[in-house]
C-alpha cells in the first residue's frame, strides 16, 4: 500500500525547517548508501550527525507522533531518525530497494525497515522531475507532493527518483519498523480502522457495531503485533 499523508508539517514549519537545512553543509549522498544503492544514487545528503539534521528530524518525529493517519497506517514501533537529501542539475536515484536493516551509526539502535517514508520539503511547481516512483504488482505509482506532505510505502518495493531538470528537490526520508511486520496484515488493520472511524463519526462511539468492530480490530492487533 502506498499512502499520501497530507499536512505532516504546516507551511510555516516547512519554512523553519528549510531555513536550517539551507544553511547547512551537504555531502555526497552515497555516504549512507548500501552497495546496490551506490550504483544508482546521484544526489546530496545532510550528514546524519549535523545539528540541522537533528533539529529538523526531531521536529518531524514530533509531528508524526501527533498525526493520527500516520499512526493508523504505520503502527510504528521504531522510527529511524529522519535523513535529508536534495537533487538538482539532473541528479537522480535509480531503481533500488532499501536495506532491510538500518543501523544508526555509532549506536546499537537498529530498525527493521518495514515501511519507507518521504516527506517533501519543496513545492512541486518549484522543480521539474524529481518524482518518487514506486513499483508493485499493480504497476508504477508516482508521488510529487506539496511541501509538508508525506508518502508512505512498503520498504520492500523497488523505487526510484526521476532526474531533477529544473530547480531543486529537497526532502526528508526515513524508515519505520511497524508493530505489524506483514504489509498485508497492516493494510487490513488500516482499512478496518478507517471504517471504524467513519462509522463512529456517523453513529457515535457508543454504537454497538462500533464497539464490536473496535474489539475485532484490537484482537487482530493483539494477534499480529510485536510490541
Curated annotation (Swiss-Prot):
MF terms in GO: 2-oxoglutarate-dependent dioxygenase activity; iron ion binding; L-ascorbic acid binding
SUPFAM superfamilies, per the entry: Clavaminate synthase-like
UniProt-listed GO biological process terms: DNA damage response; intracellular iron ion homeostasis
Cofactor: Fe(2+); L-ascorbate
Residues annotated as binding Fe cation: 96, 98, 159
Fe2OG dioxygenase domain boundaries: 78-178
Cofactor binding comment, as recorded: Binds 1 Fe(2+) ion per subunit.
The keyword Iron appears for this protein: yes
Catalytic class of the enzyme: oxidoreductase
Entry keyword annotation includes Transferase: no
Binding site for 2-oxoglutarate: 169
InterPro entries in the record: Oxoglu/Fe-dep_dioxygenase_dom, PKHD_C, PKHD_hydroxylase, Pro_4_hyd_alph, Pro_4_hyd_alph_FE2OG_OXY
Keyword list, A-Z: Dioxygenase, Iron, Metal-binding, Oxidoreductase, Vitamin C
EC number: 1.14.11.-
PROSITE patterns registered for this protein in UniProt: FE2OG_OXY (PS51471)
Top-rank lineage group of the source organism: Bacteria
Name recorded for this polypeptide: PKHD-type hydroxylase Bcep18194_B0892
Organism whose genome encodes this protein: Burkholderia lata (strain ATCC 17760 / DSM 23089 / LMG 22485 / NCIMB 9086 / R18194 / 383)
